[in-house]
Every structure is written in structure tokens, then in C-alpha cells.
Amino acid sequence: EQEIDVRGDRRLNFTLKEDAVTLESVHVYGKSKSQQLREGAYAVNALNVKSLINTSQNLSAIVNRTTGVKIREEGGLGSDFNLSINGMSGNSIRYFLDGMPLDAKGSGVTLANLPPNIIDRIEIYKGVVPAHLGTDALGGAVNIITNQQNKNFLDVAYSVSSFHTHQFNFNAQYVEQKTGIFIKPVFSLNSSKNDYKVKNVEVWNESKGKYVYEEKKRFHDDYFSLLGQVEIGVTNKKWADAFCVTASYSKTDKELQTGAIQSIVYGEAERKSDSKNISATYRKRNLIFEHLNFNALLSYTWDHSCTVDTAFRKYNWNNKYINTTRNEITGDSKSIRHYKRPRTVARANFDYALNDNHSINVNYLFNRLGNKRYDDVDKTFSKSNDVLAKHIIGLSYNQRLLDGKMNNVFFVKDYINYLMVTQKDESWISG
């Protein structure tokens, strides 16, 4: 800094030079998305799973660590499970993948076989579910958020564990920075014999002439699942912050070992499924005017599952059988039961920020599920072609007071359901 006295017609020329200042460090403080969710108005746990993505644990085991959440699995890899949130379970809990119903990926895709290395965090809502998810869940929801990094990466994991269990996960992304175009392939494969030993099973002892309890190995519980997905899109354009198209295919094969109770043993019955899905998503901030954000989703799924029960046999835990005149599962005639369930999902969401502390959100979700049932060999089975369509409209007002120390959400939802049922037989007979 220098002071110069200019008098009269004296002419002075000034040349400015850049003065660079070197800083030791720059600290930027802010709250992560997970922390913001935990401090919001909803009862929600946000799990950061980055440290667990390349372990042998599946998502159901990771979610089971959360307070108030309990998962009970019926067996090993690929077995059915029941998730409860604060005591609520079953259909009162819904599952989402980036805000899209997980069912849209197909009936074979669950928490048990979704590849962990595509996940950024998991949001677990306990009780009240935000209107923007567009669901009729009463007990809570699990929303799985995938990795949205705008950079190139490659993540490959392979694990081998007990009972001939193999898991392979591949996740990659290539981004062309100049154009904003990206491609993200995902591939996952899981297989297991699930031939672990079960204690206290009832078997007939010929020498003693009575039933005794022994430890036996499971012999008909193989599991195989495959998931392949390709996502292609573009980011940071004038007409869209993000637009992408996703195509996926999934397949599962599951042998059935037991019925509702452990003493009922199967040796031939199995369940299969395969599904194809195509979807498109669109996001744009400041859509028409400033502070109006919009995102949309459109998805269609071809879902097919089949239960094969054609053996007239009765098995025991010694892997021996006697011939009978009934199948294993229902005790009826031979059956190859097919279920074709096409699903259409469409969602539109508008979010408008009135200011830094007040915002309004409007959400519409359309979810249509078909259910066509038929049997290849059981001629007495009554075919059906049922339809369930849901329209869910949600309006919410978000309020932030006292410098973020108090958060309020006021919302209302409207449910419009359409149901067409042609089924004529009892559900316990037809499935």
C-alpha cells in the first residue's frame, strides 16, 4: 500500500501486479445427506455402507444392524426373510431403489441379492413415510440410494464362504466429461449349496422303532441368482440435470427344502423366476422458473415366475423317499404353475422452495400390476388374469424453524385403487 500526491497536470502511469497469497488450508464445513436426514422431521436412519460394500455381507445383514429393525431369515443365501421395523412387517414395509419401487426390478430382486457395491447409503423410515416416495406403507420403508458419482470407476468383488457359497459383483462407470454422457454396467452373481446341518430334526429310526431327533444336512436347497444392468445417460445439460435409460435382467433358481414346518421335507420342488425391466429417469432444477425442481420416472417390467412341483414322492431327512399319489407342496396333482406379472410404474414429483425455510412438494405415483396365472400340466387349475392399479397423490409442506432446530412436515395423501379379479379358486389351492 502506497500513498501518492498528484498535483496539477502531472501525469502518472500505474502498473498493477498480482499479489498471490498462499493459504495453508481451506476448511469447508457442512452436513452430509445422511446427517440432514437424521436431523429432519421423519424418524429415519441413514446408513453409510461404503465401508461394507466389498465384504461378503448382503444388504439384509447390513440393514439388520439398525436399531429398531429386525430381519429373520428362514435359512441360508437366497432364503425368504421377514423384515420388521418397530414391530411392523410384511406388506406394511415397502422397498425402494433410488425412489423407485424395488418390485419394478422383478420378483427375484431383493435385499438378499442386490449387489452392495452399487450402494451409497440406505434410508430406513420408521413409521411415517415421506409423501415423495408415493407409497401406501404403514410401518415404514427402506430406500436404497445408489452411487451417483460423476467420475470413472471400476469396482469388482468376489467372495467364497461356507456351504459352497460364491458371490461376484461388478460395478463400473465411464463418463465423457466434455459431453456429459455416461455408461454404467452392473453385474452380480450369487450361488450356494446351502448344505448346512440342521439340529433336532425328526427322523425314523428303524432299529429303535420310533422317531428320534438327529442332526441332518440339507440336501435340496441350492440357490442361484443373476442380475445384469446397463445404465446410459447424460448429465449437466441445459434441458436436464440428468437423464438416463436403464435396462436390466434378473434370474433366480431356488430349490425348496422344507414346507411350513421342518418335518415336511421336499426333494424335487423348485421355484424359478426371470424378469426384464426398462426404465427412464429425468431430473431438472429450476424447471420453468427458479426454485422449482422436477424429477420423473417411467418403468415397465416383464416378470415371470414358476413353481415346479411334479414329483409324486415323500422325502425324509435321510434323502430317501417313498412313491405317493400326491405332489410335494400342495398334496394335489402334478403342477408347473406360472405367474406372469407385468408392472408399469410412473412417477412425477415437483418441489418448490418458497424460501430457505419453507417448501412445497407434490408427488404422483401410478403403479399397475397384472397377474396372469396358468398351469402347464394341472388341467383342473383355473386360469386367471387379474389387475391391480394404484394412483397415489401426495402433497406436503416442509417447514424449517429456529435456524434448523425445529423441522415440521405437514402432508396429505390420496389413494385411488382399481382391482379386477377373475380368480375362482381358493388362494391356498392356487397360490
Language-model regions: role of each:
Residues 7-51:
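Short, acidic, small-residue-rich periplasmic hinge/interaction motif at the N-terminus
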Residues 11-15, 59-62, 79-84, 96, ...:
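N-terminal periplasmic accessory domains that precede
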Residues 44, 60-101:
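Extracytoplasmic beta-strand/coil segments of soluble accessory domains associated
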Residues 94, 125, 141-147, 153-161, ...:
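Predominantly transmembrane beta-strands of Gram-negative outer membrane beta-barrel pores used
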Residues 105, 124-125, 152-155, 209-216, ...:
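Extracytoplasmic loops and strand-loop junctions of Gram-negative outer membrane beta-barrel proteins
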Residues 178-262:
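Periplasmic-side early beta-strands and strand-to-turn transitions of outer-membrane beta-barrels
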Residues 231-252, 271-431:
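Face-selective signature of the C-terminal outer-membrane beta-barrel domain
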